[in-house]
Regions:
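Alpha-helix termination/capping residues and helix-transition junctions
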Residues: 2, 15, 83, 114-117
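Histidine-rich, glycine-flanked metal-binding segment
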Residues: 1-4, 9-53
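Short catalytic-loop micro-motif centered on adjacent basic/acidic residues
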Residues: 91, 121-122
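Metal-associated gating/positioning segment near the N- to mid-region
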Residues: 45-115
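Glycine-rich, flexible loop/turn motifs
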Residues: 38-39, 70, 116, 122
């Protein structure tokens, strides 16, 4: 599905500018002052900021610490991240005492697989 965001303010590492953004599936295909296509859903982005997805490189989902477990697991934490514009998280994978790093990482993958709503890494 193609979506064309019209008249938004694009925010990038080079500053801000008024532009249209054409997205095809999960990829940004074009950013330009004026884009015209016939086969895209049009979204009026006037007065809105168009920014890339953010990366949170320090999360702790479903982590047992100090006799308690963190409030968010991968399902709730990733949905909250997406609502705030974060599209990728990097979680702290901590093996249990006596576990190998490989086994600890496998456990974290099991906690996230099928539950995490955004991209993730460890």
């Amino acid at each position: 599905m193609r979506v064309l965001f019209k008249n938004g303010t694009v925010v990038s590492g080079k500053g801000t500018r008024r532009a249209d953004v054409l997205v095809d599936g999960e990829k940004i295909r074009r950013v330009a002052r004026e884009i015209h296509v016939d086969d895209a859903q049009i979204v009026d982005a006037a007065g809105m900021l168009l920014m890339p997805g953010f990366i949170d490189a320090h999360t702790h989902f479903d982590l047992d610490v100090c006799n308690t477990t963190t409030a968010d697991d991968f399902a709730s934490g990733s949905r909250a991240a997406l609502r705030g514009g974060t599209t990728t998280i990097v979680d702290f994978a901590c093996p249990n005492k006596g576990e190998t790093l490989h086994d600890g990482l496998r456990l974290w993958h099991e906690k996230a697989d099928g539950k995490c709503a955004c991209d993730y890494g460890f």
